[in-house]
A protein has these predicted regions:
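Beta-strand-rich recognition/accessory modules
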Residues: 5-7, 33, 79-177, 388-406, ...
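Short, glycine/acidic-rich hinge or "gate" loops at secondary-structure transitions
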Residues: 39, 162-164, 274-275, 314-324, ...
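Acidic/polar, glycine-enriched structural segments that form the non-catalytic walls/loops
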Residues: 117, 134, 139-140, 145-231, ...
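Aromatic-rich carbohydrate-recognition surfaces in CAZymes
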Residues: 144, 239, 246-254, 258-376, ...
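Extended ligand-binding clefts on enzyme/binding-domain cores
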Residues: 316-382, 386, 401-402, 437-501
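Polysaccharide-binding surfaces and accessory modules of carbohydrate-active proteins
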Residues: 1-114, 165-192, 327-330, 334-341
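Inter-helical turn/loop segments and adjacent helix faces that build the functional surface
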Residues: 13-17, 159-160, 310-319, 414-430, ...
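Acidic/His metal-coordination segments adjacent to aromatic residues that form catalytic metal sites
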Residues: 216-224, 273-291, 382-398
Length: 501
């Protein structure tokens, strides 16, 4: 069930009897968070509201979408009962009936104005903002006496019955049983990773940090309708950082998800920014807002390294995966005019077949393109999305010393991993031919001190990978590949120490 349970306990902490009429109130928005900004009124007209013995059920007629409206298949319910299962005596199913004339949600007349009786079960209304206003029977609490109420906030499919939901959750004893089950579930989730640093508050905070990636998978990121940032989906960093947590907590699912994530990498070293719900579901950005972050190429290796360290699965580097392809090329600085949406979002070779490369090849694409993509100080450049606050505009001349250091460390890691592949009997690796010129130590070493030489080499690579690649593969010996990566890492380390430290 998609249900949130809430228990409210009223206690008389005074010295005299207290008489009151308890009222619970939960607004029912009942549609996409987008409608908080666009078409709020017209979508409220779609609401079909029913009063139920235990509360309010809203079933909109349509799911509003200007690209094509769809019949709605879910209902939104706010139901409640006293601790012993007794139903409310009346409900206020709309914002208008709950707030009253001249009232507000801070001072609703249904609560403060005598004589507003609410509606009984079995009433139907249409076209209003919905409200889960539940009035319970008038009670008198003696000093020290307590009274509990249980609320069930649910999203129901067509075949789900509100009565069944209340039978399952709707009294104090059932609430307590489900609360115990819920605590046990999350305690077991968190038990796989425990941190004790001798300070109780910090240990508790670490439990919350451990829990966050799981909640993010369930809820998305900034999913609140009035939040400043985000629409509930996950970004590129989230994919890899969430995998880090899952490696420690739920490692069984990680390998397939990790492999799927690599399908989002473009051949220019950037990556898809619109991420679907299913693993490996990456979509073309058609809103004409190219977004590239310079650090995005660094994170996949860190997650992959932890996976291999924990599993010993070095052969993962040899698994093959597709590349992402859309209209953006040259790290979103240009558009591939030959690409159309009908071409799909998978890189193809000149014969029209989908190209698949090893995971190691994907990692090389990310790191080699970053190595040559330098600014005037020979430090890896910032990209347009790194400074998008409308003021700094560091994309034009900005460089990042911190992430250059991370890429340097990663190149050293890659060099060591290449050597380690010999343990599997591997002697050479094969990569698409257009990538090999970026391994310049194999044929014609570049002067790494020359910014112009690096930029020219990267431009040559971009030019031959704009739309498709030939599909030819070139063999590279492990030792030669490792030496090239080590040379790049060594140069970056020395350059940073000499110029930036």
């Amino acid at each position: 069930s998609s249900v949130e349970l809430m228990r409210v306990v009223l206690a008389n902490v005074g010295s005299a009897p207290l008489t009151l009429t308890p009222t619970a109130a939960v607004p029912i928005f009942g549609r996409s968070a987008d409608r908080a900004r666009d078409h709020r009124h017209v979508t409220s007209l779609l609401h079909r509201i029913a009063t139920h013995p235990y509360g309010v059920v809203v079933r909109p007629t349509l799911t509003f979408d200007e690209r094509g409206h769809r019949f709605n298949t879910v209902a939104y319910a706010v139901l409640g009962a006293e601790g012993d299962g007794t139903a409310p005596v009346a409900v206020f199913p709309t914002l208008e009936t709950f707030v009253g004339s001249g009232g507000s949600l801070d001072w609703p007349q249904a609560v403060v104005e005598p004589g507003l009786t609410g509606l009984a079960a079995g009433r139907r209304l249409a076209g209003y903002e919905a409200m889960g206003g539940l009035r319970f029977g008038r009670i008198t609490l003696d000093p020290g006496q307590r009274c509990a109420y249980v609320l069930a906030l649910g999203i129901l499919d067509d075949d789900e019955d509100p009565e069944a939901m209340m039978a399952r959750y709707g009294d104090d004893a059932r609430f307590e049983a489900w609360l115990t089950r819920t605590k046990t579930h999350w305690d077991q989730k968190l038990a796989s990773l425990q941190v004790d640093l001798g300070e109780a508050r910090f240990n508790g905070w670490m439990k919350w940090v451990t829990l966050q990636p799981i909640l993010r998978r369930i809820c998305g990121n900034s999913f609140l309708p009035y939040h400043d940032y985000g629409r509930g989906g996950r970004g590129w960093r989230d994919l890899w950082q969430d995998q880090l947590a899952l490696l420690l907590m739920e490692p069984g699912e990680v390998r397939d998800q990790l492999l799927s994530n690599f399908a989002g990498i473009r051949l220019d070293g950037s990556n898809a920014t619109i991420i679907g719900d299913a693993p490996g579901d990456f979509r073309a950005d058609r809103n004409n807002i190219p977004r590239v972050w310079m650090d995005h190429g660094a994170w996949p290796l860190l997650t992959t390294q932890l996976y291999m360290d924990r599993s010993g699965d070095l052969g993962f580097l040899l698994e093959e995966q597709e590349y992402f392809k859309d209209s953006w090329i040259q790290r979103a600085q240009a558009v591939d005019g030959s690409w159309t949406p009908e071409d799909g979002t998978k890189l193809r070779n000149s014969a029209g077949s989908v190209y698949r490369g090893s995971i190691l090849e994907h990692l090389l694409v990310q790191h080699l393109t970053a190595f040559f993509n330098v600014g005037e100080h020979n430090i890896i450049r910032l990209e347009g999305a790194d400074w998008n606050d409308g003021l700094d505009m560091a994309r034009l001349r900005g460089e990042s010393v911190a992430f250059t250091a991370l890429y340097a460390s990663n190149l050293r890691r890659l060099s060591a991993l290449v050597v380690a592949l010999s343990q599997l009997g591997v002697k050479e690796l094969r990569f698409f031919a257009e990538l090999v010129p970026l391994l310049d130590r194999l044929h014609a070493p570049l002067d790494y001190d020359s910014v112009s030489a690096k930029r020219a080499r990267l431009a040559e690579y971009f030019a031959v990978t704009e739309h498709t690649i030939r599909g030819e593969r070139v063999a590279v010996a492990l030792q030669d590949l490792s030496a090239d990566l080590a040379a790049k890492a060594d140069w970056l380390y020395a350059h940073l120490r000499r110029q930036e430290w």
